[in-house]
Amino acid sequence: MSRLKILEAYLQVASLGSVTAAAKHLGVSQPSVSRMIQELERDLGQPLFERVGQRLVLTPKGMVLRDDVERALAGFVNLWERAREVVGEAEPPIRISAVSALAFGLLTDAWKAAGEGANAPRLMVEVENPDRVQNAVMSGTAQIGATSAPLLHRDLVLEWLGTAPCVLAVPEDDPLARTEGPVELKALSGRNLVGMSLRRGVPARIRATLDAAGVDVRVKVRTTSTMNALSFIRAGAGIGIVEPLTLTAEALPGIRILPLATAIPYCFGAVTARGVPVPDKARELIAAMQVVAQHRLDDFTLIPPEEHQSLLASLTKQEARL
């Protein structure tokens, strides 16, 4: 039995929580899907599903496998589409891996600036965390990485690098919302905080800055998404220090944004793989992203190439203090 079909069956059962529903979606019999799941579990030596009520849910091992299977199947689909494009001489899409802040805050306007109508570039965008963005570029899965620091790697070319200070997001009925800022860090002491949960990068620098200032906060919610953090802040879970890019894309009612008296830099840019040619349209998109960042962020600073390494090294050192 095709291993690809087995993985497709696993993913459908994981998504739908039912062998019957997965079989209907795949157009095969229920016993066939059951056999495929049993074969996969036998080969791996681990149960991948357990029953909770009427649904099948992934075991911890099954959850770990899911991301890899989704990525592998998406890669197969992309490969098939690229093969058809080569045969049909269609211009392939620019493959981009981006963190959510840049995908949401820069890419749409950069795409519009890079061309209109028939001249607009075709894009294939995957939204990932910073480490996976870098891996996608180095492995060749993506031609462009739109990501945040850390960015230093010998196999990457840093096309441009910029910084902008993080901001404080509070509910519009919060006492701090009545101020104009900048807000001192000590004003956050004892408050409930909606925090970002990534181990490195700006979440680590936020934690290090609060720790260095002796500011004790109660983290009520941690999330990897700025949009998700803002939703919790609006719902009353607390206040939050967030990167500034997401907020430039769309105004969020119920949220007040304030500057901080202590600068916590959000460092971001575009990377490509060293030694790999970059198509002209991809280069135009990279340049357009920089222009959009400069236009959207009043406090944006473009870092000269000769200062890239020292800045990124200093940010990494700051994170290490935590």
Regions found by a protein language model. Give the residues of each.
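Residues within the DNA-recognition helix of helix-turn-helix
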Residues: 29-32, 36-39, 110
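Beta-alpha-beta core module
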Residues: 154-160, 164, 227-275
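Secondary-structure junction motif
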Residues: 178, 192-213, 278-287, 292-305
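Alpha-helical linker/hinge and terminal dimerization helices associated
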Residues: 43-44, 65-87
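Flexible hinge/capping segments at coil-to-helix
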Residues: 156-193
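Short helix-boundary/capping micro-motifs
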Residues: 11-29
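A short LG(V/I)-centered, amphipathic sequence patch enriched
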Residues: 41-60
